[in-house]
Amino acid sequence: MAELSISPDEIRDALKDFVQSYEPGKASTTEVGYVLDAGDGIAHVQGLPGVMANELITFADGTLGLAQNLEESEIGVIVLGEFAGIEEGMEVRRTGEVLSVPVGDGYLGRVVDPLGNPIDGQGEIANEGRRALELQAPGVMQRKSVHEPMQTGIKAIDAMIPIGRGQRQLIIGDRQTGKTAIAIDTIINQKANWESGDTNKQVRCIYVAIGQKGSTIASVRGALEEAGAMEYTTIVASPASDPAGFKYLAPYTGSAIGQHWMYGGKHVLIIFDDLSKQAEAYRAVSLLLRRPPGREAYPGDVFYLHSRLLERCAKLSDELGAGSMTGLPIIETKANDVSAYIPTNVISITDGQIFLQSDLFNANQRPAVDVGISVSRVGGDAQVKSIKKVSGTLKLELAQYRSLEAFAIFASDLDAASRRQLARGARLTELLKQPQYSPFPIEEQVVSIWAGTKGKLDEVPVEDILRFERELLDHLHRNTEVLSQLKEKNVLTDDIIDAMDKAVDRFKLEFQTGEGKPLASVGSEKFEPAKAEDVNQEQIVKGKR
C-alpha cells in the first residue's frame, strides 16, 4: 500500500491559504428559476425567491418577462415578446431592474412598440435616457390649477365643452361614431402652435393605439403625415395581433414618454385609443394568472389600472417647470350604455366627458357630440375669453331646441316664438357640423358662433349655412382685420363687435342662396302671432293638467 506523500502540515497550510484568499466582494450568487408551464403570453416560474413585483426577468432564449404574481411556490410572469419558444424546464434569471422605456425628442415623428422599440423601419432612435413605466403621479402640492386652453379646433367642443392643458377629458361613444376623428383633429390643430416656435405654445402629441387593426393605425399615421402633424407626434402601437401583455403595457409606455417632456417644462397631449381594449387585455392576463375575477370577470384592481394611468396627466406647478400633460382617453360603449363597469370607472376618474351618439352620427350631425350630457368640469377656467363670451347662450339654446323639436313632432300649430326658436336651433345645429381633418382656428370659431347666436343667420336657408360660413370667413380674411384682431387680443371688444356686425351685414348683401337668389330677397319667415282663441284654449288645457 502506497504511503501518503503529503504531510498533514502541508494540507493544513494549503487549506489556510485557500481560506485566506477568499474575498467576499468578488463572490456572486445568481438566483435561477425554471419554467413550469407557458402559453397565451403567460408563464409560471418556480424559484427566484427574491424577485420583486414588476421586476424584469430573462428567459434562456433572451425573451424578457414581467413578474406579476408573487406566490409561495411560483411566480406568474407576463412574457414580453414571442412566447412560442418558451418551454417547460427552461432556465429563468433575475435582472434586478424594473421595466423602463427610452425617452427623448428622438421619438417625435416615430412609431414604436410598447417596449419603445421603433417599428417604422426608420432606424434606431436617439434617446435621452430611460424612464420607468410605473411612475408615481404628481402630488397635490406639485400641481397647479388648469388655466391654459387646449384648443381642439372643433366648434362644438371649444365653445361648449372646453378643454384645458393638464385636463383629462373622456371621449365616449359606440363604435363608428367619430371618437378617433376628434382625437386626430385635436392633434392636427396643434400644427400652428408647433410652427410658431414658441415653447410655451408648442404641444408634443402622443397617440397610443391599443388593440386597433393594423390598417387603422396605418391610416391614422397617413392622415397625420398628410396634415404635416407627424413631426410633433409619437405613435405607440399595440395592434390587435399583439399579445394581451403588450396591450396592457402600451398606455404606460406612452405616459412615460410624455412625462419626460412634462417634467422638462413642455406641454404634451396624449390620446389613449382606447382604454376599453386595455381593460379587456388586463382581464385576459389576470384570468390567465389565475387571479380571482370580480364584476364582469374583471379583476378587483381594474379601477386602479386606469386611475394610476390618468392621474399622471397634470398641470405642474411653476417650481417644477409648469409643464403639462393633457389626456384624452377613449372608451367604446355598447348600445350607448354608459352605465357599464369600465365606462363608469373612467367617467369618475376624468375631469369631464364628451358623449358621441350614434343617432346623431347617422343623422349626419358630425361630430356627433351630444351637448346635453357632455360636460367639462375644469376647462371653463381655461377657455379663451372671446369664445366664452359668444358661446354663453349656445348650450342653452341647443338644449331648448332639442326639447322643443321633440314636442313639435306631435304639435300641429306652434306659436311664433317656438317657430322662431326651432328655426334658430336648426341653423345652430347645422353650424356646428364640421368635416374631418378641418379644425377651425379659434378666431374663426368666434365669428361663426357669434353670427349664429346673434341671429345673423336667421335669413339664411339651412342647406346654405355651411357655405355661408365658409364664404363669410373668406370675405373677412380678404377685406377686414377682424380675424387678426381676434387672434391677437383673444378678447371680444365693442370695436371688434361693431366691425363684425358691419362686415357680416355687408356680406349678406352679396351672398346668393343655393337657388341663385340674393339673400336680401329671401327674407326671414314671417311668424303670425297666435290667435286669442288658441291662447285661451292652451290656458284651459294647462288648467286641466
Curated annotation (Swiss-Prot):
Keywords: ATP synthesis, ATP-binding, Cell membrane, CF(1), Hydrogen ion transport, Ion transport, Membrane, Nucleotide-binding, Translocase, Transport
Function: Produces ATP from ADP in the presence of a proton gradient across the membrane. The alpha chain is a regulatory subunit.
EC numbers on record: 7.1.2.2
Family: Belongs to the ATPase alpha/beta chains family.
Membrane topology of the entry: Peripheral membrane protein
Subcellular location: Cell membrane
A single Gene Ontology CC term: plasma membrane
Subunit: F-type ATPases have 2 components, CF(1) - the catalytic core - and CF(0) - the membrane proton channel. CF(1) has five subunits: alpha(3), beta(3), gamma(1), delta(1), epsilon(1). CF(0) has three main subunits: a(1), b(2) and c(9-12). The alpha and beta chains form an alternating ring which encloses part of the gamma chain. CF(1) is attached to CF(0) by a central stalk formed by the gamma and epsilon chains, while a peripheral stalk is formed by the delta and b chains.
Source organism of this protein record: Clavibacter sepedonicus
Positions with a binding annotation for ATP: 173-180
Site residues (Required for activity), renumbered to this chain: 374
Enzyme category, top tier: translocase
A Pfam family that the UniProt record links to this protein: ATP-synt_ab_N
Principal location listed in the UniProt entry: membrane
Catalytic reaction equation(s): ATP + H2O + 4 H(+)(in) = ADP + phosphate + 5 H(+)(out)
Protein name: ATP synthase subunit alpha
GO MF terms, alphabetically ordered: ADP binding; ATP binding; proton-transporting ATP synthase activity, rotational mechanism
